Amino acid sequence: MRSFGVHVAVPDELGSLARTLAVPYYDDALPAHDEFHANRVHDVALRLASDVDRRVKTGVLAAAAWLHDIGRPRERTDDIDDHVVWATRESGELLAAEGIPKADIEAIQHCIRTHSIRASSPNAETIEAKLLFDADKLDATGAVGVTRLACIIGERSGRSDERHAVIDDFTANRAVTADQDDVSVLRKWADERLEALHTEPAQELGASRSEYMDEFLARFYDEIGVEGTQ
């Protein structure tokens, strides 16, 4: 198994430009899909790129990482229907205005277009698109993933004005019942993403993060106890 130590990637001009273009779009983003999420995806994507046995266009990958979720704030407020479709188009226009070569723009757009785990998302065909997908999904695993997914539950609950899930375990003998998901939804969401990973380095990193989530949930169940009194 590879050793995943600290890896600092030096951003190239395309990645730096994309960051400058992307950051203002995240001003109204909620924590699960803000510029810090984009930054983590960027860093993990480049980390994975250094461990694949393929030549990776790191500029394309870095740019796509910064731009992939710029439509999230607008989708959340129903200003647009699909953040992926919107971000793909918007990114193309932004990069074209900066004189970026058409081939690079199309490569970045493919990464953005295929980064979602939604059933409607097309398959990632290039190594850059696969690495972006993997890095994005890994951000929903491990300690970061527990935090992000809890944020997403809060976001969805606020948007629907109904509890999306509760911080409890409905397998326990409770005096209350509910038809929402319980805390195990964190594990379910993470597993769906781990099973979809494309690259070997991502799968190895995902296995480590999965172990942490098992430890977290075990501690959670221990803390609430069967009757929630411990």
Predicted regions span which residues?
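Divalent metal-dependent phosphate-bond-processing catalytic cores, especially two-metal-ion Mg2+/Mn2+ enzymes
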Residues: R2-A9, A29-E35, R40-R54, L67, ...
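Short alpha-helical hairpin
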Residues: V6-V23
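Short amphipathic alpha-helical interaction patches enriched in hydrophobic/aromatic residues
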Residues: Y26-A29, A49, I70-E75, L95, ...
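An active-site-proximal "capping" alpha-helix that borders the catalytic cofactor pocket
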Residues: V41-H42, L46, D82-A96
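His-Asp-centered metal-binding catalytic motifs of divalent-metal-dependent phosphohydrolases/nucleases
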Residues: T58-T77, H83, A87, S91, ...
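Hydrophobic, well-structured mid-protein blocks that either form specific transmembrane helices
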Residues: L94-K130
